[in-house]
From Swiss-Prot:
Belongs to the globin family. Heme b binds at H100. Residues 2-151 form the Globin domain. InterPro entries: Globin, Globin-like_sf, Globin/Proto, Mb-like_M. Gene3D superfamilies: Globins. The keyword rRNA-binding does not apply. This is Globin.
């Protein structure tokens, strides 16, 4: 699945909005991961370097949780920086898919993420369900899931 020009534009604009301000990427990452814990079944069980069953406030103060957030943000940032270069985007998707296959994290997690990411984007950006941003994020996760199926 390739991303449309509208997807690319919406992804770029929304990532800039999500990560704006002091500690923007860190805060966006924390919000996304906490949202995933609440909205993707069994997601908390996938993390062993920190106690993912702590309260959200405790997680925000957990150094290992923050390290994982930084890893996730770096991977997302790499994908988003490459959306206008199809070859680089595919290479980044391949690398990310292989790392998740090695960790035995597959479509049972990324399928629900694809289905529900729109609600995170809508809430975080204050946009409606029919807006380009939620659609674009769903399409990005769909592209990842297609790559994950082949990994």
């Amino acid at each position: 699945m390739s991303l449309s020009d509208a997807d690319k534009k919406a992804l770029d604009a929304s990532w800039k909005k999500l990560t704006a301000g002091a500690d923007g990427k860190k805060n966006a990452g924390i919000n996304l991961v906490l949202w995933m814990f609440a909205n993707v079944p069994n997601m908390r069980a996938q993390f062993s370097k920190f106690n993912a069953n702590q309260s959200d406030d405790a997680l925000k103060g957990d150094a290992e949780f923050i390290k994982q957030v930084n890893v996730i943000v770096a991977a997302l940032d790499g994908l988003l920086q490459s959306v206008n270069n199809p070859g680089q985007l595919q290479a980044n998707l391949d690398k990310l898919a292989k790392s998740h296959v090695n960790l035995k994290i597959g479509l049972e997690f990324f399928g629900p993420l694809q289905q529900n990411i729109h609600s995170f984007i809508e809430s975080a950006l204050g946009v409606g369900a029919g807006s380009d941003e939620p659609k674009a994020w769903g399409n990005l996760i769909a592209a990842f899931n297609e790559t994950l199926k082949k990994a």
